[in-house]
Amino acid sequence: MKIPKRIAQTLMNSLKGGVVPRVGLPYVTVGRKAEIDALLHDVDIIADGGASFRFIVGQYGSGKSFLLQTIRNYVMAKNFVVVDADLSPERRLQGTRGQGLATYKELVRNMSTKTKPEGGALSLILDRWISGVQQAAVEASGLSVTDPALSPLVEKRISAVIASLSEMVHGFDFARLLTLYYRAHLSGDDETKAKVLKWFRGEYATKTEARQELGVNIVITDDDWYEYLKLFACFLKQANYAGMLILIDELVNIYKIPNAITRQYNYEKILTMYNDTMQGKAQHLGIILCGTPQCMEDPRRGVYSYEALRSRLAEGRFSGTHKDLLSPVIRLQPLTPEEMLILVEKLADIHAGLYEYEQIVAQQDMVDFIEIEFGRIGADSHITPREVIRDFIEVLDIVYQNRDVKVRELLSGGDFAYAQNAVQEESADGLFAEFEL
């Protein structure tokens, strides 16, 4: 398996550090076929003008973020725009100190397309939209780009897009700013273009500032930022993209909010998103939220503590142990030992290619490693890919640098320390979940 060294190094560094790489995921993807297929079905619905909403639930290290990145890369290749953010104490869905707006800013900052997958694609999208409208007008009229008669035709097409947005909540102001951007683009006014981009990114703190610089008497706030994402989704379809996917990870940070009322406001925002997508109010929009079982199911602090969400999301009496990937909640099951073995085989190949050595970890060594990992107490239900990956990369690093060390000796020795179990991590967090100042 030949992998560019830049990608191989990124994979090794990210995976050993316990984080999901942005590049090279296909080289290490194993399992999760049913979950990926279910999410890709949602993608088809979004492209047809529908909307979707999913929770991905799994323990720390079970592959939630990995699955998000896999879907992210796939939909960008299918001409979707993706915005993603990790929640934190400073980034929530709703807050009294701008935490909701901070999440919006992070989402827009990370706006990505196939040609700009690292984020910051907003200006590229707007410029591409204008160029696309101009090209369509040229093809329809037969006029040249420099012909003065082309400008009214382009204006007419721009107006048609803007009119379709004006009917939505905050659509009039959104459309007005698109018009400002288009006219600034025509006149080469980079300063105005920068101001419009600043507004779209949610960086105007007051209405007064926005009115003085752009002539609009509105700014994006904690209360209405989600409405602007719905506007973006509809605009992006008009700009010849397939739709927009919103990816929000670390939902546990809402679970950890000490104030019950603040938590309820955040769950209310989730309910709004859920209802919009399920009832058909949102179009060309997909939303995926990721969290742990505890942050979903805890009856006092979790998502299910909000009765309106619990009644919509809780499993029915027929589900039992069977998987239902058509429900809004996708629960990640542990990878099988066979899938884990395939994963470590891929890691061994990548490691050998990166450091240019002949494979020194035998197939039987890998089998022994997996047997030992799954032989730990509670591993059948609690072991996660993150633990296995970090342990195995550590084994590879040690035997590569110490050629006299045998894998079997290393695994049976007392010096080798396994990665911390995901359940232990979650339990440690839970010790302080109720602590308030």
Model regions: which residues?
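A short, basic N-terminal segment
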Residues: 1-52, 150-151, 405-437
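The catalytic "switch" region of P-loop NTPases
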Residues: 2-7, 193-361
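Conserved phosphate/pyrophosphate-binding and hydrolysis machinery centered on Walker-type P-loop NTPases
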Residues: 25, 29-33, 61, 97, ...
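Amphipathic alpha-helical segments in well-structured domains
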Residues: 36, 68, 100-104, 263-270
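P-loop NTPase nucleotide-binding core
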Residues: 55, 62, 66-239, 400-402
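Gly/Ser/Thr-rich loops at beta-strand to alpha-helix junctions
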Residues: 60-65, 252-253, 384
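C-terminal alpha-helical "lid" subdomain
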Residues: 179-198, 319-323, 333-437
